[in-house]
A protein has these predicted regions:
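A generic structured-segment signal
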Residues: 90, 101-103, 118-126, 130, ...
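Conserved beta-strand edge residues that scaffold enzyme active sites
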Residues: 39, 143-144, 166
Length: 189
C-alpha cells in the first residue's frame, strides 16, 4: 500500500532501508523530539542497523496486524521523494482508538528538511485516514519543536493547547503541544 501526490510517496519500509533509519536516528533533533513522550507504541530511535532491521520487522508485523483488524493502527510509512525514490523520513499511525480518534507522528532526516516533504506526508496520511473513517486525527509535539509546529499548521491542523509536564524526555518532564484535524473543518480535503 502506497500513497503519493507526485512529490512525495509514502510506502512500507523494506529491510534495505535499515541503514537510512539508523543514520537518521543519530540526528539530535530526531533523538530529542521523537521520544515516546506520550505515544503508545511509538518506538525510540534505533541506535544500530541491527536495531533498525528489528524495527522494520516490527513495522511489517504492525501492517499485518492492522490488516487483520481492518484499521491501520501502528502502521508506519517511509517518506520518499516521488521522482527519485530517495528516502526522506518516517510517518505513521501511532494509534487508532475505538472512538475512531487517530494519533499520527513523523520525522525527517536532516538532508530532507525544508522541502515540504513532512507537510505533504501529513496531508497524504490524514486524507487517507479520513477516507477510512477517522473522526479526528491528532498529533503531539514536544514544546520547542517549532519546525514540527509549522508542519502541523501548514497541513491544516489546529492548535488545541499545551499539556504542561505531560511527557518525559531523559528523565525530565516536558510540555506537549496538541494539534488536531477534523474531517468537517480540515482545509486539505
Amino acid at each position: 500500500m502506497s500513497l503519493s501526490d507526485d512529490v512525495v510517496t509514502l510506502r512500507p519500509w523494506s529491510r534495505d532501508d535499515a541503514g537510512f533509519i539508523a543514520d537518521a536516528s543519530g540526528d539530535p533533533a530526531i533523538q530529542r523530539y521523537s521520544v515516546p513522550h506520550d505515544r503508545r507504541g511509538h518506538p525510540s530511535p534505533p541506535e544500530s542497523i541491527a536495531a533498525a532491521e528489528a524495527l522494520i520487522e516490527e513495522f511489517a508485523a504492525n501492517w499485518r496486524a492492522s490488516a487483520a483488524m481492518g484499521r491501520p493502527s501502528g502502521v508506519t510509512f517511509a517518506i520518499t521523494d516521488a521522482a527519485s525514490g530517495e528516502l526522506a523520513g518516517l510517518c505513521g499511525v501511532d494509534a487508532w482508538s475505538d472512538e475512531d480518534v487517530v494519533q499520527i507522528g513523523y520525522w525527517l532526516a536532516p538532508r530532507a528538511r525544508g522541502r515540504g516533504y513532512a507537510t505533504r506526508a501529513v496531508i497524504l496520511l490524514t486524507r487517507w485516514l479520513f477516507e477510512l473513517g477517522a473522526a479526528r486525527v491528532f498529533l503531539t509535539i514536544v514544546a520547542g519543536n517549532q519546525p514540527s509546529v509549522e508542519v502541523a499548521r501548514r497541513a491544516g491542523f489546529v492548535y488545541e493547547g499545551t499539556m504542561r509536564s505531560h511527557g518525559v524526555w531523559r528523565d525530565e518532564r516536558c510540555d506537549v503541544m496538541w494539534f488536531a484535524a477534523l474531517p468537517t473543518d480540515w482545509t486539505h480535503r
